[in-house]
Structures are given as structure tokens and as C-alpha cells.
Amino acid sequence: SNELEHDFLWRHYIALPEKGKFSVFNRTHYENVLITKVHPEYIINERIPGIDTMEDVTDEFWTNRYESINAFEKHITTNGVIVIKFFLHLSKEEQRQRLLRRLETEKHNWKFSPGDLAERELWDKYQDCYEDILNKTSKEHAPWFVIPADNKETARYIVAKTILDELNKYEFHYPELEEKIKDNIKMYHDKLSSEK
């Protein structure tokens, strides 16, 4: 795939919004320190120089990856991107209930994959990885917000409120019109108003 021709941050960098625009990222570069840490065999497929065997995927490798993420986020925030990261914390029991509902509700069957059960067996390993991610990558310029997510409505409210609170820290302005256009606003308005 094209992604494997680049470093692990490339696909996220090219997906960043233009200045003045918003984007929501689901399944971000944190997959590269989550899924690949739970399944380090996936790292071999990334064709990283010096990483040829599972023994090459060391603690130093993960430290470097966290540092790359922190440097990436520092770079983009320095250049005007506002980064707000949410970890939707779901209990194991709530995850079980949601998976059961997917199986019991025909219109939601499509959301289920047998792989969900295999990954669920690795719950504790995922929790350890989440803890590492939160501890090693929550920075003042790119903080993590841990959201209790067993109740969807509550989680959505907290996320929306957090986004609003974070954006209210900034003073945003609409783009300015060129003087030539601004000086002729009344003329443009009159022209449109007089159309029949």
C-alpha cells in the first residue's frame, strides 16, 4: 500500500485540515502505538530500516515512536493547529453489552466482526497500552481528555462541552474582505436587490 512507502505519521500529516478549518480524526496515529504494540508483528510489515525481526521491536523503539508523535503534535500546534485528544473510556462490561446488542439487533449486525472477540481477549494488554499512551503523550500543547463513555449521551455532552471550552480560549475572526470589495458592498447589495 502507498502508506507503507512512508513513515507512520505521513497519512495523518497529509490529512490535516487547511488553516482555518476543522477536522475530526477517528483512528489516528495512536493506532501505531496501540494496535502495533499489542500486535508487534505488524511492525515488521512497515519496512522500517533496522526493524527486521520481532527482537528489533524494543522498548527503545516504542520510546522513539512516542517521541515522534510528541514532536509531530508540537510541530503542528506551533503552526496553528489546535489539538484536542479524547480517550473514550469504555468499561469491559459495557463493551460486552454493546457487542451483544450488535449481534442481537439485525440492523447492527454489520458492525460486528469475529475479530472483536479475539481483541477482547487482549483487554488487559490494551489497557496497559492506553495507560502508556496517555502518560507519554499528554502535553500542554496537545492534552488528552479521558471521557467516561459507558453512557453515550453523557460522553457526547462532555466531548462537546470540552471542545467548546477549549475553542473559547481562542479569539477567532472571520476572514477580512479586500478593501475594494468591502467598499462596494452596498453596490453589490443594491444590484442583487433590484433583480426581478
Sequence positions of predicted segments:
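Conserved nucleotide-sensing/catalytic segment adjacent to the nucleotide-binding pocket
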Residues: 1-61
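Conserved catalytic network of the ASCE P-loop NTPase/AAA+ motor domain
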Residues: 14-18, 75-81, 137-139
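Conserved nucleotide-binding/hydrolysis micro-motifs of P-loop NTPases
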Residues: 1-3, 28-32, 40, 89-96, ...
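Structural signal for well-ordered, non-membrane alpha-helices
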Residues: 70-73, 77, 131-134
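A glycine- and Lys/Arg-enriched "phosphate-lid" helix/loop adjacent to the NTP-binding pocket
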Residues: 37-66, 76-128, 177-182
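NTP-dependent small-molecule kinase module
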Residues: 105-108, 122, 126-196
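A structural signal for short, well-ordered beta-strand segments and their strand-loop junctions
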Residues: 23-26, 83-87, 146
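A Trp-anchored, charged/polar loop motif used as the substrate-binding/catalytic surface
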Residues: 6-9, 63-74
